[in-house]
Swiss-Prot record:
A molecular function (GO) term: cellulase activity
Major localization class: secreted
Keyword annotations from UniProtKB, A to Z: Glycoprotein, Secreted, Signal, Virulence
Protein name as annotated: Inactive glycoside hydrolase XLP1
Glycosylation-annotated residues: 174
Domain remark in the UniProt entry: Conserved residues in regions X1 (position 26), X2 (positions 39 to 44), X3 (positions 77 and 78), and X5 (positions 146 to 150) are all required for full binding activity of XLP1 to host soybean GIP1.
Keyword field contains Signal: yes
Function according to Swiss-Prot or TrEMBL: Secreted XEG1-like protein that has lost enzyme activity but binds to host soybean apoplastic glucanase inhibitor protein GIP1 more tightly than does XEG1, thus it outcompetes XEG1 for GIP1 binding and frees functional XEG1 to support P.sojae infection. With XEG1, is required to elevate apoplastic sugar during P.sojae infection.
Source taxon at top rank: Eukaryota
Gene, per the UniProt record: XLP1
Homology family: Belongs to the glycosyl hydrolase 12 (cellulase H) family.
N-terminal signal peptide: 1-20
Natural source organism: Phytophthora sojae (strain P6497)
Length: 189
C-alpha cells in the first residue's frame, strides 16, 4: 500500500516580537515554509470565548508563533481549537522518508481555571497522493491538565519502541479519520 504523508508540526513558542494577531475561526498566515492556522474547529464546545494566533518571527527553517485564548463553559477536556504551524513540503511515500529532523521549544502560561492541552506533532496520511486524510498519527510531547488520547477503548493497543524511546499506542476515530496516538512523554529514554 502506498502511503503519503502530510506533516503538521505543532509548535507553541512565546517571544516578545509580535506581528498582528488573527482571530477568525479558519484564519491562517503564510510564513516562509509554514502555514500558521488559528483553527477553531470545535469552538462551539465552549459556551463563549475566543482565540487569536500570531507569527512572532521567521528565520530560515525556524518559526516562532503564539496563541492566546479564553474559553468559558463546556467540558474542560473537550477540544475547542487546534492552533498549529504546518510545514509546507512535497508529498512523499512513507517508505521514502528516512528521517524527519526537528527541534521544538515551547512554553505556556495560564492564569486561572482549568488548563487542558497537549503539545504534539500531527501527521496525516492517505493511500494515494491526491487522497483525503485516512490516518492521523499524533506524537504527543506533552500533556497538561488531564489531556488524553483519542481512544475507542480508553486503553493502549500496544507499546511501540522508536529508537530508545517506548510509547503506549492508542487508536480511535476522529470523524472519518483513524487516529494512532502515542500520548505524553516516552515511557523510557
Amino acid at each position: 500500500m502506498k502511503s503519503f504523508l502530510q506533516l503538521v508540526v505543532v509548535v507553541a513558542a512565546l517571544l516578545s516580537v509580535s506581528t498582528a494577531d488573527f482571530c477568525s475561526q479558519w484564519r491562517l498566515s503564510k510564513a516562509g515554509k509554514y502555514v500558521i492556522y488559528n483553527n477553531l474547529w470545535n469552538k462551539n464546545a465552549a459556551a463563549s470565548g475566543s482565540q487569536c494566533t500570531g507569527v512572532d518571527k521567521i528565520s530560515g527553517s525556524t518559526i516562532a508563533w503564539h496563541t492566546s485564548y479564553t474559553w468559558t463553559g463546556g467540558a474542560a477536556t473537550e477540544v475547542k481549537s487546534y492552533s498549529n504551524a504546518a510545514l509546507v513540503f512535497s508529498k512523499k511515500q512513507i517508505k521514502n522518508i528516512k528521517s524527519i529532523p526537528t527541534k521544538m521549544k515551547y512554553s505556556y502560561s495560564h492564569s486561572s481555571g482549568t488548563f487542558v492541552a497537549d503539545v504534539s506533532y500531527d501527521l496525516f496520511t492517505s493511500s494515494t497522493a491526491s487522497g483525503s486524510n485516512e490516518y492521523e498519527i499524533m506524537i504527543w510531547l506533552a500533556a497538561y491538565g488531564g489531556a488524553g488520547p483519542i481512544s475507542s477503548t480508553g486503553k493502549a493497543i500496544a507499546t511501540v519502541t522508536i529508537g530508545s524511546n517506548s510509547f503506549k499506542l492508542y487508536k480511535g476515530p476522529n470523524g472519518s479519520t483513524t487516529v494512532y496516538q502515542p500520548p505524553g512523554l516516552p515511557l523510557s529514554t
